[in-house]
Amino acid sequence: MVFERSVLMKVYQIRMEIFLLEDIVINKIQEKITAFIDSGFKTDEEWLNFHEKNSFKNYCYDQLYPVENDRVYKKGKIYTLTIRTVDLELAKYFKLVCVDNHIKEIKGLVAEIRVLPKKILETVYTLTPMIIKTEKGYWKEAIS
């Protein structure tokens, strides 16, 4: 996907409610969210090709909200997963496919898309700037 400087880029935010089927400790939550998102890509050949292609995916997501004080996300509770992308088709995928998706630990419930208002960024903070996946798997297991 190539963006021209003169084109107004829209940023889509998807807020998804998810239900936990098992307790998940905070240091494993990124891995489980990634598995949840990845498993949805496998339901459609076009999205599977997108997933398997070695390229920037143009989306990011955060930790679940609310964060638990004891650092364990609880089985039986509903949390919010926020995903952002500049690709409208990808935003639609997250809204339509992920809500019907589930893995052993996570089940998607409902999602909504909104366009974030344009504003000038003064500072950018992120806890997960990039996730790297090699032929051997995700960076945490394959590179470190």
What role is predicted for each listed range?
Residues 1-144:
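RNA-interacting cores
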